[in-house]
Amino acid sequence: MVIIMEKPWVEKYRPKTLDDIVGQDEIVKRLKKYVEKKSMPHLLFSGPPGVGKCLTGDTKVIVNGEIREIGEVIEEISNGKFGVTLTNNLKVLGIDEDGKIREFDVQYVYKDKTNTLIKIKTKMGRELKVTTYHPLLINHKNGEIKWEKAENLKVGDKLATPRYILFNESDYNEELAEWLGYFIGDGHADKESNKITFTNGDEKLRKRFAELTEKLFKDAKIKERIHKDRTPDIYVNSKEAVEFIDKLGLRGKKADKVRIPKEIMRSDALRAFLRAYFDCDGGIEKHSIVLSTASKEMAEDLVYALLRFGIIAKLREKVNKNNNKVYYHIVISNSSNLRTFLDNIGFSQERKLKKLLEIIKDENPNLDVITIDKEKIRYIRDRLKVKLTRDIEKDNWSYNKCRKITQELLKEIYYRLEELKEIEKALEENILIDWDEVAERRKEIAEKTGIRSDRILEYIRGKRKPSLKNYIKIANTLGKNIEKIIDAMRIFAKKYSSYAEIGKMLNMWNSSIKIYLESNTQEIEKLEEIRKTELKLVKEILNDEKLIDSIGYVLFLASNEIYWDEIVEIEQLNGEFTIYDLHVPRYHNFIGGNLPTILHNTTAALCLARDLFGENWRDNFLELNASVSKDTPILVKIDGKVKRTTFEELDKIYFETNDENEMYKKVDNLEVLTVDENFRVRWRKVSTIIRHKVDKILRIKFEGGYIELTGNHSIMMLDENGLVAKKASDIKVGDCFLSFVANIEGEKDRLDLKEFEPKDITSRVKIINDFDIDEDTAWMLGLYVAEGAVGFKGKTSGQVIYTLGSHEHDLINKLNDIVDKKGFSKYENFTGSGFDRKRLSAKQIRILNTQLARFVEENFYDGNGRRARNKRIPDIIFELKENLRVEFLKGLADGDSSGNWREVVRISSKSDNLLIDTVWLARISGIESSIFENEARLIWKGGMKWKKSNLLPAEPIIKMIKKLENKINGNWRYILRHQLYEGKKRVSKDKIKQILEMVNVEKLSDKEKEVYDLLKKLSKTELYALVVKEIEIIDYNDFVYDVSVPNNEMFFAGNVPILLHNSDERGIDVIRTKVKDFARTKPIGDVPFKIIFLDESDALTADAQNALRRTMEKYSDVCRFILSCLTGDAKITLPDEREIKIEDFIKMFEERKLKHVLNRNGEDLVLAGVKFNSKIVNHKVYRLVLESGREIEATGDHKFLTRDGWKEVYELKEDDEVLVYPALEGVGFEVDERRIIGLNEFYEFLTNYEIKLGYKPLGKAKSYKELITRDKEKILSRVLELSDKYSKSEIRRKIEEEFGIKISLTTIKNLINGKIDGFALKYVRKIKELGWDEITYDDEKAGIFARLLGFIIGDGHLSKSKEGRILITATINELEGIKKDLEKLGIKASNIIEKDIEHKLDGREIKGKTSFIYINNKAFYLLLNFWGVEIGNKTINGYNIPKWIKYGNKFVKREFLRGLFGADGTKPYIKKYNINGIKLGIRVENISKDKTLEFFEEVKKMLEEFEVESYIKVSKIDNKNLTELIVKANNKNYLKYLSRISYAYEKDNFARLVGEYLRIKEAYKDIILKEIAENALKEADGEKSLRELARKYNVPVDFIINQLKGKDIGLPRNFMTFEEFLKEKVVDGKYVSERIIKKECIGYRDVYDITCHKDPSFIANGFVSHNCNYPSKIIPPIQSRCAVFRFSPLKKEDIAKKLKEIAEKEGLNLTESGLEAIIYVSEGDMRKAINVLQTAAALSDVIDDEIVYKVSSRARPEEVKKMMELALDGKFMEARDLLYKLMVEWGMSGEDILNQMFREINSLDIDERKKVELADAIGETDFRIVEGANERIQLSALLAKMALMGR
């Protein structure tokens, strides 16, 4: 069975982001009212995951099988209350994951208010009024199916509606229903009397009505009346009938008020009712059935009723011109609908029936259609190579056609997937055989295969390679079906891949792959490589999420029951509206509307407060937490005592069992096992235990155990960088978990049994209060677990009873010896065995000691009885010394196991707890152990050839080793051959050690050293790998748990210990200090709520954020998340200076196509992106316009860089200045996946180059060595064909005969092994190695190549040397920039060389210096030549623009031009206001004049693409042609050139500043002066003088005069010069400080922001913009709740003020010395300060410095400083004594002392250099201590070093 859909489609396409699901403005408005009334204080801002998506009260919905208005239903349930009301007896209809109609339970209902609605009308007559953010399931015009907010809908979109609906059917009299149909259609009941009339012109219908009336109503008097001037009728007088009509509310009812009675709507009698009603009021018009009614309710009921039979009807309104009344027409059209009506309802009237049959024709394909997402269908076609019909090209498919096509397609898909599964299964097995086994069975194999024995020996020794046929024969004999694998490989290559694809991955030629797969090849290793590659490709297909998604789409199309109704009208309504919604868990939709429509339910207010939800308040939000199940085993220390327990038992110890709302419990006496930095198992303290409830969990089974946990609890795994956390939901079968086998230290060797001492002690009673445990007694206690029992006579006289088989002499003797040695009284007897009580086959040894018996009873059982199933290993045993724990296990194994000690021991027990205890005890005692059903297995570490505990995951280890590959002296691949070539998933630590011994450590780089150190740690680790076997989801519905392990985040748990990631440490701590404690206190003043500021929310983990969310829901009154962002049209600059709108960047960032931007640091990594509407955070958007004309729109709290630092838009005013970076513009980022290098064309070029070098083709070459590469490949192909049939010498002869060349035997041997050389092949491989063949036009490297190419054409030279040298002459600054570009491409250049030069120019002698670099890179050299760069003198050979540039995108063209002008272009010249001189000049010989002109024409065309005008000028100088391309001299043209192209390298920065000056100058003329001129002309007629106007507008008087004369606006004389611009405006040489000339508020907008890694900034529209503080890393539920303000660190006085306030309230005497001490130890952290104060207060009411330093385990700073000064003065012994005092008396750790020493460095009276040395020494010591070195020794060594250092 192939599982296609991972989750419901309806769920998949529901809104997933906060922006999609929240309408915060209205909800917040209402919640504020609640807070003002103080009735629901916890509702404000601590809202649930989503709010809002609602409907108006008149929306119809089917609830409990009845059509009702949603408002009426919810008002009944909520009693008019706004907000959330729980319900458990409501059912509605909705669609499931396959688009099928089902009935669902409603969990709660919701009522609210809003000011805005969207009214939607559809083609079929549907009319919906929903909130703007209500999602509706839509089929877009592009074929996409998704939930879309109402405000985003467009006319032409298709709305999902059901094809049929379900009701809970009830019994109803069919004849009575028919009678009602007639009555409602053409009947009338008099209001005052018992008269009923039925008026109809059809005699048969009248007769039928009369028959039914007579039958149904016994008192009926019936009379038919025929009238002359009106329609005949049936007159009925019946009290019973009228009373029946009256009950239904139909008596005297007008035609516009009638409805279908609800009892009939839900019964099977509905068809009889409809037939009768359509007989009366229905008819045939054109090609449709039409029924007209004056009742809108009846019309809508009819549409619902018809859907019960799958009949889709249209509702149409018409105004009757005679009476001006609105009538509602039900229209049934389309043949399939008409046929369904005929089959299920039909007409009784023959005339109508006949007409109906006449209009049923072939289906109209243009009706009832769905728009197809052709991209998904095509993706399936391309990925699975499925053949499709031509229908795929059509945009719209009819419903029936769609189902037919997709069902056929699914059959083909399933077949292909099954075939791929079979191929995968076949390819999982490697094709390599064990030649050692072949050697052992050589004779047998020779007999069975017919291959000579000596030939097989040659194969074994590697002297000859077997052909594939012979290899298969040998493999078959060994029981290995390789033929099946090869067949699978061939099928996959031909059917699902290609030789080209496989060849590309293996860096082989297509022809080689074909030869290996299709011929009788000898290259079995190559086949194995192909197998592994194909297996990887198969797995990629089967795990392709896009493919799975596309198949899910097809499955949805094939099985859905949706009719897509086109939207024809959308209107926004404004006013006050009450809105309603229902919550349907999991599927989140229901059917409702005036005509049935699929509606999304809200996820609003899931858990606004516990009092609203009762016991279910957590159900919908706590499932996000990561936790393990209650019965998960764990080994802990409580108050220093070891205990093997479960989380459920910890719950009983730490939580109040009667308060389920208590979710966190801070603990200070709990420790768990975890791992340290060296991967060693250690005890670590727990800070908090967390619990919450969930419905479902995962059970993951692995080798020897299982673990139960929530889907997003993280499990620690190993990757190439070390330990990483991976969510349980992402774990796959075959992954490796980490467990441990370690020797955990134990100290106990004595038991204190005093508490078990008998009360009445006599001389005969042996008292053993201190019970020494040696190896014998440990063994005895272990044996008790296996074979012991305890018995008492009364409350005294206890016995410890051992029952052993009478044949177990060794055990009996050993036990007797131990009992005697310990001096216990004993009694022996024989007894019956458990199998035969009569047969005395067992011996009992009874130790007669009540004290020991009481101890055993209390500690060896679980408290639920003393049977075998209740046995446990006592907690005290876990604390014993290691040798004693091992002896205990031996005793247990000797009594109750099979197998041999020191090998595999199987211990059986009925007690699950005992087995788990055994596994944990073994693992902390250095013994590998596993758990199975009723059995624990121990694998002792001695004497075993294999142990799982010595194994680690192979994949990450191999990745690490590959990073060291070049520094390994030896064949490490042979050592790991089973992992590399046979797919073994694990590798032993011994092999890692073996490889590490081969590493040349001295030659390792810093990064390689890190990898080496990591491998070294892993080779010695106590961790090892266990493979995941099975994963399942199980029902749970109970508490799950987690623990927080500060500064470690890991712990071991499980029935077999697995390393888990703890999830909540950071969150718990932050919540307690930042939110929880703050929220607990009452608000001050009249406002009944407070604001919570979260100053570190962007650093919280996801789990911490969830914890924050829970606490907010429980305590907080107000929490809004404040973000600062830009509007979507802001263009941000990428590192290569392409532009992209920020909204487009975020889309590409999410798709991982872009991840870097340009900011103050240069290139920076983007960590996160966010989008939302600024109304959500209550920040309006402002537009800023600068004096250069640059504009940007940003929220009021967004920051921009100014000379004075970052400033918010709110702070900025007109005439303030912001900094601008003149980034290039005009080249947008566009996806362009064309490759810049065509390998086929390059190979062709290399072939021609080979011929120039003297290589020859077949026919001209005399020997193989002379051949061009292409013909060598032909020889290779032929050699491989012959290799299976002939010897090497025979092959040589045939090749020489066939091709007429000489070839050596060595060459033949190499060719048989697939080895081929050749000039062309060599450089194609080099291009691939460098990755240049993968570079696409949208890649930054394409721009680098283009830029270098332009510069080299200008100032570069390709020499004629054999090595392929490239010379580039330029300034030193330019060369440094060029070298950086070359490095990015993997090209190494020489150092920069400077030389003195002398030459003549125009008759003048010129002396100076020149600088250049050379590049010896033949691949780059050949590539440049391939692109058209001439070798030798360009002035003779001419210039070319490479085709890939000429036909490339604007990006590569711009970079080419920048390089070209950077080399040969003139730098812009500017003086005062004017600029000129941008041109490109080249001197060439006459021979290349025309070619150069062509080149310049091409450059001119390129410039035109950037709207830059230029012209070409040719002149003669010294018999050479100076060809110039001159940029036309006007400011606007220059500005276009400088802002869109500029120069590469050194000239670039100056050119940008010139460009920005021009921009300001032109904007001043076009914007500012224009406005001044207009205002001046208006005011010139007034009283003001011309001089006053000039002063007012800061312009010369003649400017005003010129405007009055009507002259063109010119630049006034007082405008700043360029020199003034550089002095006054330029900041840091690259930024321009520009004045804001306009600031305006433009309201709320959709806004965007990004977060960068190194620097909180990015360039947008030239502005230096501040990014947000990681808002997108905050989970949506937090974003929907919080207002985050970033705070700077607290000042000392602020902390002091707060501490004094607290001390006063708590009645404490806080001394000045105590206050200073708290400030010192808290390091500016208020949380720490308050905690220290509270801890100190527990010891004394007087808080002085002594008590502060005591409770915080800190030394006085003066003592630390004194110790450091003593050391620096050379008084080492005194300094060391003080150090020991700090460690012993103050209890300080080495890390604490180092931290304080580091803080004191600045206060020491030593020079700066000594301070640097001291900081370095402290850092080195800290590292050594962290790595596990002895603290005292390291700190003493540090003091010694300081003594030597001196002052």
Swiss-Prot record:
Keywords: ATP-binding, Autocatalytic cleavage, DNA replication, Nucleotide-binding, Protein splicing, Repeat. Pfam families: HTH_3 (PF01381), Intein_splicing (PF14890), LAGLIDADG_3 (PF14528), RCF1-5-like_lid (PF21960), Rep_fac_C (PF08542). This protein undergoes a protein self splicing that involves a post-translational excision of the intervening region (intein) followed by peptide ligation. The keyword ATP-binding applies. One of its GO terms (cellular component) is DNA replication factor C complex. Residues 179-311, 780-927, 1348-1508 form the DOD-type homing endonuclease domain. GO terms for biological process: DNA repair; DNA-templated DNA replication; intein-mediated protein splicing. One of its GO terms (molecular function) is DNA binding. InterPro entries: Cro/C1-type_HTH (IPR001387), DNA_pol3_clamp-load_cplx_C (IPR008921), DNA_Rep/Repair_Clamp_Loader (IPR050238), Hint_dom_C (IPR003586), Hint_dom_N (IPR003587), Hint_dom_sf (IPR036844), Homing_endonucl (IPR027434), INTEIN (IPR006142). Part of the RFC clamp loader complex which loads the PCNA sliding clamp onto DNA. Belongs to the activator 1 small subunits family. RfcS subfamily. Heteromultimer composed of small subunits (RfcS) and large subunits (RfcL). NCBIfam families: intein_Cterm, intein_Nterm, PRK04132.1-2. The intein interrupts the potential ATP-binding site. This is Replication factor C small subunit. It comes from Methanocaldococcus jannaschii (strain ATCC 43067 / DSM 2661 / JAL-1 / JCM 10045 / NBRC 100440).
